Each structure stands twice: as C-alpha cells, then as structure tokens.
C-alpha cells in the first residue's frame, strides 16, 4: 500500500493530474473510488462516505453482517444490503471511533483482494477533524494492502491549526506518505515546453514571454 499527497496552489492542476493517474489506474484494472471534501464541512467524513458508498454499489459481497454493523453509521447505503444492520452500542466515543476506523480499513482490505484499489480524496484542505483522523489512520494501516490512498490539497490552506497539518508534517519523515508539490511553470519551463511542442528550437523570446504572461 502507498499514500501520495498532491499539494499546490489553487488551479495549479492537482485534480487534473490525479484524474490522469486514475485513468491509468483503470486501464490497469484497478478499482477507483473518489470522494471530495466540501467547503461547508457539514457532513463528518464526507469524502469517505462518498467513496465508500460508490464502492458498495460495485462490491456488495465484500461486506459481512458484522462489518455492516460497524459501517452503517458511516455508510447508510449498507441498509440496502443489510436492512437489519445497526451500529454496535458503545459508551466510549474513542473506542467507537477506533472500531469505525478499523472497519473502514477492513473494508478497503477486502475490496483490494480482488483487484488493486485506488482511493482518491480531493480538496483535503477542507477536511474536518474526523476526516483528517481517518485519513491518517488509513495511511498508517495500508502498507501491507493493495491500496493506493491518493489525496490533493491546497498548500496555502493547511496552517498549523488545520486538522491535517500534523499528518502532512510527520508523514514524510516517518515514510508514511509521499507529498508531491506542484509549482507554477517558470518562464524557462514554458519556453522548453513550447519548443518541444512545436519541434522548433528557434522560437523567439517575445513569443514565449507572450504565452507565459497570458497563461
């Protein structure tokens, strides 16, 4: 398993790069499920709910009755498969959260046994505390699974107080996740790209400057 984070300013192409990677993953017969954080952040775990609900539509047989009881609070669509599923009672919120996190891990692991799985969560700069905690948990628990956890976030929106900040800061030294920073193209980069595209090493500086400032 692997975790990769794409970071960069708004509009730099994080989602586009991820989309191209997902196309390649599908061509390699990987399962691909996508979730997006919302600016409102009014639904806890929203991107996971979105992605796992989609996964359930394609792989209903990967959920056991026991797992359904743990996941039903997060993925209500499970009731379509297990109408009797009810969340397991718990007087300890931390233990309940840990059971939920492990249930998500188990579900992803079961899904990946058939085919490798890519879980892409976009706009993580809008992640709530619960979502950030679950993302961190999954990233730490998938090394032995055939799962790629792919995320994208706006670097300038992740301050010290952001719920994902600690994970982003500590994940690379701990070798938990590889962050790929996307930067704007320099004037030199644009020139090199134009010359390659036009197959002309003599494209003039004014032309390159015009395109650089336009884009």
In which residue ranges do the predicted regions lie?
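Key residue(s) within conserved catalytic/signature motifs
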Residues: 1-215
């Amino acid at each position: 398993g692997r975790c990769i984070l794409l970071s960069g300013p708004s509009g730099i192409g994080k989602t586009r790069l991820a989309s191209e990677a997902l196309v390649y993953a599908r061509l390699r017969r990987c399962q691909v499920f996508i979730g997006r954080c919302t600016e409102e952040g009014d639904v806890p775990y929203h991107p996971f709910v979105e992605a796992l609900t989609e996964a359930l539509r394609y792989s209903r047989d990967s959920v056991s009755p026991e797992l359904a009881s743990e996941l039903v609070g997060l993925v209500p669509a499970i009731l379509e498969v297990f109408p009797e599923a009810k969340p397991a009672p718990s007087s300890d919120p931390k233990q309940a959260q840990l059971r939920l996190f492990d249930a998500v891990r188990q579900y992803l692991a079961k899904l990946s046994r058939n085919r490798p799985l890519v879980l892409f969560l976009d706009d993580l700069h809008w992640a709530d505390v619960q979502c950030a905690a679950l993302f961190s948990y999954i990233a730490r628990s998938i090394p032995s699974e055939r799962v790629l956890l792919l995320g994208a976030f706006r670097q300038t929106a992740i301050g010290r107080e952001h719920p994902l900040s600690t994970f982003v800061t500590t994940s690379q030294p701990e070798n938990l996740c590889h962050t790929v920073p996307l930067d704007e193209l320099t004037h030199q980069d644009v020139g090199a790209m134009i010359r390659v595209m036009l197959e002309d090493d003599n494209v003039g500086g004014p032309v390159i400057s015009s395109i650089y400032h336009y884009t």
